[in-house]
Amino acid sequence: MLDAFAKVVAQADARGEFLSNTQLDALSSMVAEGNKRLDVVNKINSNASAIVTNSARALFAEQPQLIQPGGNAYTSRRMAACLRDMEIVLRYVSYAMIAGDSSVLDDRCLNGLRETYQALGTPGSSVSVAVQKMKEASVALANDLTGTPQGDCSALVAELASYFDRAAVSVV
Protein backbone atom coordinates (compact mmCIF):
# COMPACT_ATOMS: atom_id res chain seq x y z
CA MET A 1 0.00 0.00 0.00
CA LEU A 2 1.27 3.41 -0.93
CA ASP A 3 -0.25 6.69 0.03
CA ALA A 4 -0.43 9.41 -2.59
CA PHE A 5 2.89 10.90 -1.47
CA ALA A 6 4.83 7.64 -1.54
CA LYS A 7 3.33 6.74 -4.90
CA VAL A 8 4.38 10.01 -6.54
CA VAL A 9 7.90 9.76 -5.11
CA ALA A 10 8.23 6.11 -6.19
CA GLN A 11 7.12 6.98 -9.73
CA ALA A 12 9.59 9.86 -10.00
CA ASP A 13 12.37 7.75 -8.51
CA ALA A 14 11.70 4.90 -10.95
CA ARG A 15 12.14 7.37 -13.80
CA GLY A 16 15.19 8.97 -12.15
CA GLU A 17 13.51 12.37 -12.21
CA PHE A 18 12.76 15.15 -9.78
CA LEU A 19 9.13 15.72 -8.88
CA SER A 20 7.45 17.84 -11.54
CA ASN A 21 5.60 21.05 -10.78
CA THR A 22 2.36 19.26 -11.61
CA GLN A 23 3.13 16.52 -9.10
CA LEU A 24 4.13 19.06 -6.45
CA ASP A 25 0.94 21.03 -7.07
CA ALA A 26 -1.16 17.88 -6.68
CA LEU A 27 0.57 17.00 -3.41
CA SER A 28 0.25 20.58 -2.19
CA SER A 29 -3.47 20.45 -2.92
CA MET A 30 -3.76 17.22 -0.96
CA VAL A 31 -2.06 18.82 2.05
CA ALA A 32 -4.33 21.86 1.81
CA GLU A 33 -7.43 19.68 1.85
CA GLY A 34 -6.05 17.47 4.64
CA ASN A 35 -8.43 18.67 7.37
CA LYS A 36 -11.42 18.17 5.11
CA ARG A 37 -10.19 14.67 4.25
CA LEU A 38 -9.82 13.88 7.95
CA ASP A 39 -13.32 15.24 8.62
CA VAL A 40 -14.83 13.03 5.92
CA VAL A 41 -13.10 9.93 7.28
CA ASN A 42 -14.06 10.84 10.85
CA LYS A 43 -17.71 11.20 9.84
CA ILE A 44 -17.64 7.78 8.19
CA ASN A 45 -15.88 6.16 11.14
CA SER A 46 -18.20 7.77 13.68
CA ASN A 47 -21.26 6.58 11.77
CA ALA A 48 -19.97 3.24 10.48
CA SER A 49 -22.41 1.10 12.43
CA ALA A 50 -25.40 3.15 11.27
CA ILE A 51 -24.13 3.23 7.68
CA VAL A 52 -23.81 -0.56 7.58
CA THR A 53 -27.05 -1.28 9.44
CA ASN A 54 -29.20 1.15 7.48
CA SER A 55 -27.69 0.05 4.17
CA ALA A 56 -28.38 -3.59 5.02
CA ARG A 57 -31.96 -2.76 6.00
CA ALA A 58 -32.49 -0.94 2.71
CA LEU A 59 -30.96 -3.84 0.76
CA PHE A 60 -33.19 -6.40 2.50
CA ALA A 61 -36.26 -4.22 1.96
CA GLU A 62 -35.49 -4.20 -1.78
CA GLN A 63 -34.41 -7.84 -1.93
CA PRO A 64 -36.40 -9.66 0.79
CA GLN A 65 -35.52 -13.04 -0.71
CA LEU A 66 -32.06 -12.63 0.82
CA ILE A 67 -33.42 -12.95 4.36
CA GLN A 68 -36.09 -15.56 3.66
CA PRO A 69 -35.40 -19.28 4.21
CA GLY A 70 -32.80 -20.34 1.66
CA GLY A 71 -31.60 -16.77 1.13
CA ASN A 72 -27.96 -15.81 1.35
CA ALA A 73 -28.50 -13.74 4.51
CA TYR A 74 -30.94 -16.18 6.13
CA THR A 75 -29.89 -17.36 9.60
CA SER A 76 -28.17 -15.13 12.09
CA ARG A 77 -24.75 -16.54 11.15
CA ARG A 78 -25.12 -15.56 7.50
CA MET A 79 -26.61 -12.19 8.42
CA ALA A 80 -23.62 -11.52 10.70
CA ALA A 81 -21.24 -12.48 7.87
CA CYS A 82 -23.05 -10.10 5.51
CA LEU A 83 -22.83 -7.21 7.97
CA ARG A 84 -19.18 -8.03 8.68
CA ASP A 85 -18.33 -7.97 4.98
CA MET A 86 -20.12 -4.65 4.52
CA GLU A 87 -18.20 -3.21 7.46
CA ILE A 88 -14.89 -4.44 6.02
CA VAL A 89 -15.57 -2.76 2.67
CA LEU A 90 -16.53 0.47 4.45
CA ARG A 91 -13.38 0.32 6.58
CA TYR A 92 -11.12 -0.13 3.56
CA VAL A 93 -12.90 2.68 1.71
CA SER A 94 -12.07 4.90 4.69
CA TYR A 95 -8.43 3.77 4.53
CA ALA A 96 -8.30 4.62 0.82
CA MET A 97 -9.86 7.99 1.54
CA ILE A 98 -7.31 8.90 4.20
CA ALA A 99 -4.44 7.69 1.99
CA GLY A 100 -5.80 9.43 -1.09
CA ASP A 101 -5.14 6.23 -3.03
CA SER A 102 -7.15 3.09 -3.80
CA SER A 103 -4.29 0.59 -3.55
CA VAL A 104 -5.08 -0.40 0.05
CA LEU A 105 -8.70 -1.02 -0.93
CA ASP A 106 -7.67 -3.01 -3.99
CA ASP A 107 -4.84 -5.01 -2.43
CA ARG A 108 -6.33 -5.87 0.94
CA CYS A 109 -10.05 -6.00 0.27
CA LEU A 110 -11.18 -6.24 -3.34
CA ASN A 111 -8.63 -8.50 -5.04
CA GLY A 112 -10.21 -11.93 -5.19
CA LEU A 113 -13.46 -10.85 -3.55
CA ARG A 114 -15.62 -11.63 -6.61
CA GLU A 115 -14.16 -15.14 -6.82
CA THR A 116 -14.73 -15.69 -3.10
CA TYR A 117 -18.36 -14.64 -3.37
CA GLN A 118 -18.85 -16.83 -6.44
CA ALA A 119 -17.38 -19.82 -4.61
CA LEU A 120 -19.72 -19.18 -1.66
CA GLY A 121 -22.75 -18.66 -3.91
CA THR A 122 -23.17 -15.08 -2.71
CA PRO A 123 -24.93 -12.93 -5.32
CA GLY A 124 -22.42 -10.28 -6.35
CA SER A 125 -25.21 -8.05 -7.60
CA SER A 126 -26.69 -7.90 -4.09
CA VAL A 127 -23.30 -7.09 -2.57
CA SER A 128 -22.92 -4.36 -5.18
CA VAL A 129 -26.29 -2.86 -4.20
CA ALA A 130 -25.24 -2.92 -0.53
CA VAL A 131 -22.02 -1.08 -1.39
CA GLN A 132 -23.98 1.51 -3.37
CA LYS A 133 -26.27 2.06 -0.39
CA MET A 134 -23.23 2.61 1.85
CA LYS A 135 -21.94 5.03 -0.77
CA GLU A 136 -25.17 7.03 -0.67
CA ALA A 137 -25.05 7.27 3.12
CA SER A 138 -21.34 8.14 3.22
CA VAL A 139 -21.62 10.76 0.48
CA ALA A 140 -24.54 12.35 2.33
CA LEU A 141 -22.39 12.55 5.46
CA ALA A 142 -19.45 13.97 3.51
CA ASN A 143 -21.71 16.61 1.97
CA ASP A 144 -22.97 17.67 5.41
CA LEU A 145 -20.72 20.63 6.14
CA THR A 146 -21.91 21.10 9.71
CA GLY A 147 -18.87 21.56 11.93
CA THR A 148 -16.32 21.14 9.14
CA PRO A 149 -13.90 23.60 7.55
CA GLN A 150 -15.61 25.73 4.95
CA GLY A 151 -14.80 25.39 1.29
CA ASP A 152 -15.53 23.25 -1.70
CA CYS A 153 -15.51 19.54 -0.89
CA SER A 154 -16.81 18.35 -4.25
CA ALA A 155 -13.48 16.79 -5.28
CA LEU A 156 -13.25 14.87 -2.00
CA VAL A 157 -16.85 13.70 -2.27
CA ALA A 158 -16.21 12.55 -5.85
CA GLU A 159 -13.09 10.72 -4.69
CA LEU A 160 -15.05 9.04 -1.89
CA ALA A 161 -17.78 8.01 -4.33
CA SER A 162 -15.17 6.57 -6.70
CA TYR A 163 -13.86 4.20 -4.01
CA PHE A 164 -17.36 2.86 -3.41
CA ASP A 165 -17.93 2.55 -7.17
CA ARG A 166 -14.67 0.63 -7.44
CA ALA A 167 -15.84 -1.77 -4.72
CA ALA A 168 -19.33 -2.17 -6.21
CA VAL A 169 -17.96 -3.03 -9.65
CA SER A 170 -15.38 -5.47 -8.29
CA VAL A 171 -17.96 -7.90 -6.90
CA VAL A 172 -20.15 -8.37 -10.00
Curated annotation (Swiss-Prot):
Coiled-coil stretches: none
Gene that encodes it: cpcB
Primary residence: plastid
Subcellular location(s) per record: Plastid, Chloroplast thylakoid membrane
NCBIfam families linked to this entry: phycocy_beta (TIGR01339)
GO cellular component, one term: phycobilisome
Binding-site residues, (2R,3E)-phycocyanobilin 1: 82
Membrane topology: Peripheral membrane protein
GO biological process, one term: photosynthesis
UniProt binding sites for (2R,3E)-phycocyanobilin 2: 153
Record organism: Pyropia haitanensis
Protein name, as recorded: C-phycocyanin beta chain
Subunit composition and interactions: Heterodimer of an alpha and a beta subunit, which further assembles into trimers and the trimers into hexamers. The basic functional unit of phycobiliproteins is a ring-shaped hexamer formed from two back-to-back trimers contacting via the alpha chain subunits. The trimers are composed of alpha/beta subunit heterodimers arranged around a three-fold axis of symmetry. The phycoerythrins also contain a gamma subunit which is located in the center of the hexamer.
Residues carrying N4-methylasparagine: 72
PANTHER family: C-PHYCOCYANIN BETA SUBUNIT, PHYCOBILISOME 32.1 KDA LINKER POLYPEPTIDE, PHYCOCYANIN-ASSOCIATED, ROD 2-RELATED
Task performed by this protein: Light-harvesting photosynthetic bile pigment-protein from the phycobiliprotein complex (phycobilisome, PBS). Phycocyanin is the major phycobiliprotein in the PBS rod.
CDD domains: PC_PEC_beta
Pfam families attached to this UniProt entry: Phycobilisome
Post-translational modifications: Contains two covalently linked bilin chromophores.
